[in-house]
């Protein structure tokens, strides 16, 4: 992504590269199965990615946005919003597919950017100002992170002039903290509200989800 978009969002002025890794939609968010059919779940996952990207494209400090995914629908949606897209080369059965995908994307953008953030793609209540404030706070540290609303996961991992060293997965908040990353303490409720379960989705809806997610849920 580069330059100014027609909707007024700013695409190329920043010095930070953002990475979002997205798994195959059919395999994503299986814990939402109690409330959505498989087809609707895929639509909701894609909508949450759309709302996350829409918020991110309005953050002036982001100079590029890259989505790495093996999923054609997710890739098309990301490209339609102006993101760069990488095909995820992670093989089936890889023991750590998410972190491998993030590391792959990091290598791809590191030639142009030394400041990188890995962001979850399931943040339908994300506000652009929240992400902008988190990026600004992260500049005070070489490596930092924002925990999710339950303080067990990681919503965003930042690296300024150093490697991301991503440790997403179970108890990633503790793993990032123990690896030396500084925990950022801003409120940022939408940034912290990733959606894995029906309870998470209810929390996001209370905050106010983006237009794409609202439409996907309404169609259910």
UniProtKB/Swiss-Prot annotation:
The UniProt entry's GO biological process terms, in alphabetical order, are: F420-0 metabolic process
Binding-site list for phosphoenolpyruvate: 154, 169, 172
Question: Using the chain's own numbering, where are the disulfide bonds?
Answer: none
At the top level of its lineage, which domain of life is listed?
Bacteria
Pathway-wise, it operates in: Cofactor biosynthesis; coenzyme F420 biosynthesis
Record keywords, A-Z: GTP-binding, Nucleotide-binding, Nucleotidyltransferase, Transferase
Q: Which reaction does it catalyse?
A: phosphoenolpyruvate + GTP + H(+) = enolpyruvoyl-2-diphospho-5'-guanosine + diphosphate
Family assignment?
Belongs to the CofC family.
Functional note:
Guanylyltransferase that catalyzes the activation of phosphoenolpyruvate (PEP) as enolpyruvoyl-2-diphospho-5'-guanosine, via the condensation of PEP with GTP. It is involved in the biosynthesis of coenzyme F420, a hydride carrier cofactor.
Q: Which HAMAP family match?
A: CofC
Q: State the protein's name.
A: Phosphoenolpyruvate guanylyltransferase
Which organism is the protein's source?
Answer: Mycolicibacterium paratuberculosis (strain ATCC BAA-968 / K-10)
């Amino acid at each position: 992504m580069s330059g100014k978009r027609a909707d007024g969002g700013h695409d190329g002025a920043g010095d930070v590269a953002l990475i979002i890794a997205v798994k195959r939609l059919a395999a994503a968010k299986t814990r939402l199965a109690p409330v959505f059919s498989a087809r609707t779940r895929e639509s909701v996952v894609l909508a949450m990615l759309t709302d996350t990207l829409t918020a991110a494209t309005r953050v002036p400090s982001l100079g590029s946005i890259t989505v790495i995914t093996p999923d054609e629908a997710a890739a098309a949606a990301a490209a339609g919003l102006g993101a760069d897209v990488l095909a995820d080369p992670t093989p089936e059965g890889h023991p750590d597919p998410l972190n491998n995908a993030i590391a792959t994307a990091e290598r791809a953008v590191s030639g142009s950017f030394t400041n990188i953030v890995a962001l979850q793609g399931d943040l339908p209540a994300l506000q652009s100002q929240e992400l902008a404030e988190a990026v600004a706070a992260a500049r005070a540290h070489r490596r930092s992170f924002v925990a999710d609303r339950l303080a067990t996961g990681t919503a965003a991992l930042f690296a300024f002039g150093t490697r991301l060293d991503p440790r997403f997965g179970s108890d990633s908040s503790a793993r990032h903290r123990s690896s030396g990353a500084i925990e950022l303490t801003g409120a940022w409720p939408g940034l912290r509200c990733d959606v894995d379960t029906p309870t998470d989705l209810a929390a996001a809806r209370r905050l106010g989800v983006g237009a794409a997610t609202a439409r996907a849920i309404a169609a259910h």
